């Protein structure tokens, strides 16, 4: 990845994705408010651990497919671009369904599991990261490099949400804490239905 402008564009896209509300951020906030900062940070670290796994698997799969069918990269570019547009429009006009889904496990495992079972994470890694690959000779290494950038940006976002939510809501009433839990379960139901 020698082209700084491509890396810069990727970082901007990733920052906009990492700091926008989603399942992991909702879980980080919920755990931070309900159980404290430590649990929110554990979710963030669990999610980052899941992202390492997703990075390695998706990079390996994409590299294998690319070596078999080099032209597939064009289709992945198109699909990735369409996915970015779809997510942008879906975010603008989203409404929330009401289904109650709970994860009964420790915070680290909750973050890890939620990241691994979230199909949107897999789609992002499989379709968006290849858009920013500039050299097909180093395809695998560039995907892993982009995955590492993604993991660090997501981790910074998740830690920021954990620290801020635990600080601002530490003295909140039980009513506010229940509202945050309900909001999380609604978001989770909405995200897994899409």
Residue ranges and their predicted role:
Residues 57, 117-123, 187-188:
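Hydrophobic alpha-helical transmembrane segments in multi-pass integral membrane proteins
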Residues 163-184:
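Interfacial loop-to-transmembrane junctions
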């Amino acid at each position: 990845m020698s082209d700084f402008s491509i890396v810069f564009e990727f970082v901007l896209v990733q920052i906009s994705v990492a700091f926008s509300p989603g399942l992991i951020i909702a879980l980080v906030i919920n755990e931070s408010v309900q159980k404290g900062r430590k649990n929110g940070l554990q979710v963030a670290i669990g999610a980052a651990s899941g992202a390492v796994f997703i990075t390695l698997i998706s990079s390996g799969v994409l590299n294998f497919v690319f070596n078999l069918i080099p032209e597939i990269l064009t289709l992945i570019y198109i699909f990735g671009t369409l996915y970015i547009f779809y997510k942008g429009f879906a975010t603008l006009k989203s409404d929330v369904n009401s289904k109650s889904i709970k994860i009964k496990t420790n915070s680290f495992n909750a973050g890890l599991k939620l990241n691994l079972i979230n199909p949107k994470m897999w789609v992002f890694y499989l379709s968006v990261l290849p858009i920013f690959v500039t050299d097909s000779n180093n395809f695998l290494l560039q995907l892993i490099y982009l995955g590492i950038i993604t993991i660090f940006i997501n981790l910074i976002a998740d830690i920021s949400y954990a620290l801020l939510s635990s600080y601002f809501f530490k003295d909140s009433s039980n009513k506010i804490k229940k509202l945050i839990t309900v909001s999380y379960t609604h978001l989770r139901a909405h995200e897994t239905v899409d």
